[in-house]
Amino acid sequence: MASTFVCSLPNPFFAFPVKATTPSTANHTLLGSRRGCLRIKAISTKWEPTKVVPQADRVLVRLEDLPIKSSGGVLLPKAAVKFERYLTGEIISVGSEVGQQVGPGKRVLFSDVSAYEVDLGTDARHCFCKESDLLALVE
């Protein structure tokens, strides 16, 4: 998931020397400078999910993978699966104001409306939600 992308594109107007009737240093400095280039650097940061500590009454939940097949064996398209209103997942870490019933390792059911999904740079999907937004503990 973590990737590095670097792209350099030269400006085509400065690729060839410009002939001027009078010698000008401006034309020569633009040929060798990087002002005529576009440089993009996108670096994704990777965090260890167990080391991320939520604040106050928030919990960090690792989402379970959505089903690819229905119970009857029919393949489900992603468009049909992504609009599920209720999600289940495993609690990874909890904030300091969370009660004793909710702790790391427990499975919970919650609504996707109240969850804030984050990308921690791993293959798994994670989200933050409040303890009061948890609907049920799943045994």
UniProtKB/Swiss-Prot annotation:
GO CC annotations, alphabetized: chloroplast; chloroplast envelope; chloroplast stroma; cytosol
Targeting signal (transit peptide) range: 1-39
Keyword Chaperone: yes
Keyword annotations: Chaperone, Chloroplast, Plastid, Transit peptide
SMART domains assigned: Cpn10
Highest taxon, organism lineage: Eukaryota
The protein, known as: 10 kDa chaperonin 2, chloroplastic
Species per Swiss-Prot/TrEMBL record: Arabidopsis thaliana
